[in-house]
Amino acid sequence: MSQSNLQRSMPIVTLPDLFDARFDNRFVRQLPGDPETRNVPRQVRNAGYTQVSPTPVRSPRLLAWADEVGEMLGIARPASPVSPAVEVLAGNRILPSMQPYAARYGGHQFGHWAGQLGDGRAITLGELISPNDKRYELQLKGAGKTPYSRTADGRAVLRSSVREFLCSEAMHSLGVPTTRALSLVATGEAVIRDMFYDGHPGAEPGAIVCRVSPSFLRFGNFEILAAQKEPELLRQLADFVIGEHFPELASSHRPPEVYAKWFEEVCRRTGILVAHWMRVGFVHGVMNTDNMSILGLTIDYGPYGWLEGFDLHWTPNTTDAQGRRYCYGNQPKIAQWNLTRLAGALTPLIEDDAALEHGLAVFGETFNNTWSGMLAAKLGLASLEHSDDDSLLSDLFETLQQVETDMTLFFRCLMNIPLNPISGNRATTFPAPENLESVDQMNDHGLVELFRPAFYDAHQAFSHAHLTRLAGWLRRYIARVRQEGEPEGLRYHRMSRANPKYVLRNYLAQQAIEALERGDDSVIIRLMEMLKHPYDEQPEHEDLAARRPEWARNKPGCSALSCSS
């Protein structure tokens, strides 16, 4: 893999080397750690973390670097793919100011209490102080065994690491609250995995992602303390989180009120987060409580996926294929269920049930209002307050599921329909608006033809029943837009910021994985460039906006994923 390939995505900015970064580790300093030092699987008590160092790897090599994250942290891109800085990002070297640890937490998995979980292969190096004095945890995922590894090997494979690296940055560019990713490093070692848990394990290349977040604390960090009846540590952890990450609450409220206000804010942020997921068609895939961020960020990119054919019941996770607990349409309900588990864990701090119920109500209100506003924007409307808007939406969702229709492409096509063609040149996947007939002049077939790029089965899409139904809905939509009486350019602008043209389709990530396995980094570099501007027309990347190709329909890694990573 060439040095030039690693650097061609954008110009190098002069920044300090990683070795000059400042670390100040308040979490380790302010919370009690595990007094035991044995790095063997075991139950940990009365501690928020265990100090543990990464296990060195044979031959680390930098595969990808996120320039924007490096600039945010004030860290220069490593001078070469095998530089000393890469040794740090692989866990082979620890800087003097780092204090690596694995966090202790528990969680509910698929609706059942799973007991102690913890960072079984993720090791936080420390808290970096950025040039603007913000704190960020740097965490290596796949860094080796910890006391929380149970029977696992503490490593991660290339395929899951590429997916996490890419999706972290894709979500940020989409405007979705998320953790970030700084680097992707190959370990030079093989990892044995049974990808679909079907009795066919095989060797895969290993990798390590350096994840970045103000905090990786989860609902499960609090759940384990409540479950193990450690109320004083529960209070310490809550005080730490509020003081560090919700300082406006700490300065204006005192216990016990501050805990209720904090829970309310966690509920509010989670409502906004899930509404964003729904807006862009993202399905997390494994919404266990240990995968829910206390800061309202998307965390732990495992068997996630993006809606291609619109389906409220779709899940990318093979483990969830039967129950579909974590499917697209269930995500708001599951988020509230998870928040209820967090509320239960916080009862030693918030004895007033009404305060907890209020927080949960805030989640529902926040999600509903945010999602309603986002749906209005996706349709180019100022709001969804007309009497027939509910039926307009429900009929749309039913119609989209009648024939396999790509969610992302459908809304981009809807954005481009020529309601009132405007002058000037507007980039579009269709002919310029002035060359299109007005929708008033189109018959049903001509109107539906504008959506051909979104259909996976054109024969079904243009059947009489579906054509009539979709065209009927489109004419209702057009009438509704005209009721607004707003300039066409305003509708287009709203929709262009709410409806991405580019998302990280599973097959695109899989192509990047397979290319890296061959030693080719050009695919991931191109994806990183495209994903920086998901709402923009990018003619040089037009092929990456197309619907999933037929060869990827049933290909492992493209259509179905497991928790194996």
From Swiss-Prot:
<feature type="binding site">
    <location>
        <position position="300"/>
    </location>
    <ligand>
        <name>Mg(2+)</name>
    </ligand>
</feature>
<keyword id="KW-0547">Nucleotide-binding</keyword>
<feature type="binding site">
    <location>
        <position position="141"/>
    </location>
    <ligand>
        <name>ATP</name>
    </ligand>
</feature>
<keyword id="KW-0067">ATP-binding</keyword>
<feature type="binding site">
    <location>
        <position position="211"/>
    </location>
    <ligand>
        <name>ATP</name>
    </ligand>
</feature>
<keyword id="KW-0808">Transferase</keyword>
<dbReference type="GO" id="GO:0070733">
    <property type="term" value="F:AMPylase activity"/>
</dbReference>
<dbReference type="GO" id="GO:0005524">
    <property type="term" value="F:ATP binding"/>
</dbReference>
<feature type="binding site">
    <location>
        <position position="120"/>
    </location>
    <ligand>
        <name>ATP</name>
    </ligand>
</feature>
<keyword id="KW-0460">Magnesium</keyword>
<keyword id="KW-0479">Metal-binding</keyword>
<dbReference type="InterPro" id="IPR003846">
    <property type="entry name" value="SelO"/>
</dbReference>
<feature type="binding site">
    <location>
        <position position="300"/>
    </location>
    <ligand>
        <name>ATP</name>
    </ligand>
</feature>
<comment type="function">
    <text>Nucleotidyltransferase involved in the post-translational modification of proteins. It can catalyze the addition of adenosine monophosphate (AMP) or uridine monophosphate (UMP) to a protein, resulting in modifications known as AMPylation and UMPylation.</text>
</comment>
<feature type="binding site">
    <location>
        <position position="291"/>
    </location>
    <ligand>
        <name>Mg(2+)</name>
    </ligand>
</feature>
<feature type="binding site">
    <location>
        <position position="121"/>
    </location>
    <ligand>
        <name>ATP</name>
    </ligand>
</feature>
<keyword id="KW-0548">Nucleotidyltransferase</keyword>
<keyword id="KW-0464">Manganese</keyword>
<feature type="binding site">
    <location>
        <position position="118"/>
    </location>
    <ligand>
        <name>ATP</name>
    </ligand>
</feature>
<dbReference type="Pfam" id="PF02696">
    <property type="entry name" value="SelO"/>
</dbReference>
<feature type="binding site">
    <location>
        <position position="153"/>
    </location>
    <ligand>
        <name>ATP</name>
    </ligand>
</feature>
<comment type="similarity">
    <text>Belongs to the SELO family.</text>
</comment>
<feature type="active site" description="Proton acceptor">
    <location>
        <position position="290"/>
    </location>
</feature>
<protein>
    <recommendedName>
        <fullName>Protein nucleotidyltransferase YdiU</fullName>
        <ecNumber>2.7.7.-</ecNumber>
        <ecNumber>2.7.7.108</ecNumber>
    </recommendedName>
</protein>
<feature type="binding site">
    <location>
        <position position="218"/>
    </location>
    <ligand>
        <name>ATP</name>
    </ligand>
</feature>
<feature type="binding site">
    <location>
        <position position="154"/>
    </location>
    <ligand>
        <name>ATP</name>
    </ligand>
</feature>
<dbReference type="GO" id="GO:0000287">
    <property type="term" value="F:magnesium ion binding"/>
</dbReference>
